[in-house]
Design a protein with these regions (language model features):
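Structural and coupling elements of P-loop NTPases
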Residues: 1-534
Length: 534
């Protein structure tokens, strides 16, 4: 198979949702149908020892939530599928933002009983900024659900995107019997003995809409209701336009139940048919697009994770390949460091499990062993003409705490742990301007990240900490030249604090919006930004 053929069979997408909409369960079932696992785990975890394959950190298994992005790969119907399973919990949204930079499309999972929720709105906005296709999977149809027409209207009104139902549900709750495929015009009736509890593939029966046998399969009432709803749907629904889908203007909608597997395989088949091959990325130096099928290799680092497996006390840099081919042992130019480095070993990751990768192509996500040379947003490339992809923005934290270790004899472990976790982008570390690590201020997007920080320092670095919450709510990066602009000359409120990050960038911490406005109105030449570059 040629490089172009390998690249064109890649499909790389992220799954996003509000917490508890069933995102990780859907990921598990896609792996089940893709043959990557023989039996699906269960994020419920109360009746058995199973946990979701994509939840690899102990705290994820204990809490039943995803706090880091997982990368999962499988082959299905000739396609090589890369899934980026992202944290649903709002406190870990920054990791999700970074992960969406590596995706070519997104699957938005919505709870059929609740419709669009707050976190879904935030993540949807990030997808629209990147103009990537957004597919919708309306989940939990096996429970009591809102009317399907109402759910479609809910998506369009709140998110401002047109929808097109690719299939239509037959009943809901205990009466959820299957879906009608609008492309093939066939009814797919699902059956399960109920004992497998969704851990194995579900049986399907295919029939024409007018087939009298559907009265027995569905009940006469559900059969007639389906006929009436399809007639109404065909009369009012917008025409399907793949170009609009690829521009992120029209969202194909699928109904199903990830827990029972109803509708999962039809979704997977249609999604892989419609979702794009690896997208061209923009070279920030020239503004030109980088063709994924070109011979020269290029990639960027979008995530760093330490201590992924207790058997491997190492750091892995997650790399999205944008063009060309990766080969184990190849040399690539590290743009930010300005030197060639050897990519000795690439790994394919299935949660905490890993396998050596000899070759990979544009669209693939692989892990690189990181001895401390990579940062989030770094570009790697080969060829005479160097490329550089845009840096990944870092978001302003909303919660701050002063951190110190309880045992002063463990200072070395404390500093190492804090720096490594910060390099992953999980936290941001600030210190007094010109100071060291004596007094460390940590900034996070959500308070649960502070709990995870304390847990990881204790379990991974054997360090216990004291934590004092601080009253700051806002952070701004100072854009003025540090050589000519002295922060001590600024007119600020008494509770505003000047700090610097680990790269020496200067920042101001504020306790309120009012304090931010004071700084902006009383210092005409002061330039502040809500975003910095990692």
């Amino acid at each position: 198979m040629t490089n172009r053929e390998e690249i064109e069979r890649r499909r790389t997408f992220a799954i996003i949702s509000h917490p508890d909409a069933g995102k990780t369960t859907l990921t598990e079932k896609l792996l089940l149908y893709g043959g990557a696992i023989n039996q699906a785990g269960s994020v419920k975890g109360k009746q058995s020892a199973k946990h979701a394959v994509s939840d690899w950190m102990d705290i994820e298994k204990q809490r039943g939530i995803s706090v880091t992005s997982s990368v999962l790969q499988f082959n299905y119907a000739g396609k090589c599928v890369n899934i980026l399973d992202t944290p649903g919990h709002q406190d870990f949204s920054e990791d999700t933002y970074r992960t969406l930079m590596a995706a070519d499309s997104a699957v938005m999972v919505i709870d059929a009983a609740k419709g669009v929720e707050a976190q879904t709105i935030k993540l949807f906005k990030v997808c629209t900024l990147r103009h990537i296709p957004i597919f919708t999977f309306i989940n939990k149809m096996d429970r009591e659900a809102r009317d399907p027409f109402e759910l479609m209207e809910n998506i369009e009104e709140i998110l401002g995107i047109k929808t097109y139902p690719m299939n239509w549900p037959i009943g809901c709750g205990k009466e959820f019997k299957g879906v009608f495929d609008r492309n093939t015009r066939k009814v797919l009736a699902f059956s399960s003995d109920g004992r497998a509890n969704g851990v194995k593939k579900v049986d399907e029966t295919e029939a024409e809409l007018g087939d009298p046998a559907l009265d027995e399969l569905l009940t006469p009432y559900l059969h007639q209701q389906l006929v009436d709803e399809i007639e109404l749907l065909d009369g009012v629904a917008e025409e399907f336009d793949l170009d609009k889908v690829l521009r992120g203007e029209l969202s194909p909608v699928f109904f199903g139940s990830a827990l029972t597997n109803f509708g999962v395989e039809p979704f997977l088949e249609n999604f892989l048919r419609l979702t794009p091959t690896p997208l061209a990325r923009v070279d920030s130096l020239t503004g030109e697009t980088v063709d994924p099928c070109r011979d020269e290799f290029s990639a960027f680092i979008f995530k760093i994770q330490a201590y992924m497996n207790k058997a491997h006390r190492d750091r892995i840099a997650f790399m999205r390949i944008c063009s060309g081919k990766f080969e184990r042992g190849m040399e690539a130019f590290h743009v930010q460091e300005g030197k060639n480095i050897k990519l000795a070993t690439g790994t394919q990751l299935m949660a905490q499990d890993r396998a050596i990768v000899d070759e990979a192509y544009a669209g693939d996500i692989i892990g690189l062993f990181d001895p401390g040379i990579f940062s989030i947003g770094d570009t790697l490339c080969t060829g005479k003409k160097k490329v550089q992809f845009a840096g990944i923005p870092t978001f302003s934290p909303e919660h701050f705490a002063r951190i110190e270790q309880k045992d002063t004899m463990k200072r070395k472990q404390f500093v190492k742990g804090m720096e490594q976790i910060a390099q992953e982008g999980a936290i941001q570390i600030f210190r007094e301007v010109g100071g060291g690590m004596e007094e460390v201020v940590v900034g996070v997007v959500g308070v649960l990240q502070l709990e995870v920080l304390e847990y990881r320092l204790n379990t991974e670095y054997n360090v216990e900490i004291r934590m004092q919450q601080l009253p700051f709510e806002q952070l701004r990066w100072v854009q003025n030249d540090p050589d000519t602009y002295n922060l001590r000359d600024l007119d600020l409120t008494s509770d505003t604090k000047a700090v610097e990050d680990m790269k020496g960038n200067r920042l101001l911490l504020f306790t309120s919006d009012w304090a931010v406005r004071w700084a902006e109105t009383h210092n005409e030449t002061l330039k502040l930004s809500e975003f910095g570059n990692i």
